[in-house]
């Protein structure tokens, strides 16, 4: 049985968010780095830095906090395509989350990108997760 690394990072971020942690440490792979880069660019996390410990690479992500409040933003992270049930979509059928307010992360032939980028380029792919 293999590990589902995408579900692991989504669960780590969700658990850190619920426990009001400021940072979360995630094992680093190429796919994970691409997803975290998208989350950083879209504003769901505040900062990311690479960390190496015992010859293993990690990403330390700082979660985004509300101004003048103690809690973090409540992000809903949902895994759509999983190892037991892959979900693919063409460019016309990529789902919109909350009318375009949320994002869908896809794995395409041109790399990992958001639903907006995939629609602009006119390509589809595997729907990895949704965030709103």
Swiss-Prot record:
HAMAP family referenced in this protein's UniProt entry, alphabetically: Ribosomal_uS8_B
Subcellular location: Plastid, Chloroplast
Predominant place of localization: plastid
Designated name of the protein: Small ribosomal subunit protein uS8c
The UniProt record lists the keyword RNA-binding: yes
GO molecular function, one term: structural constituent of ribosome
Gene3D superfamilies per the UniProt record, alphabetical: 3.30.1370.30, 3.30.1490.10
Disulphide linkage map: none
Gene: rps8
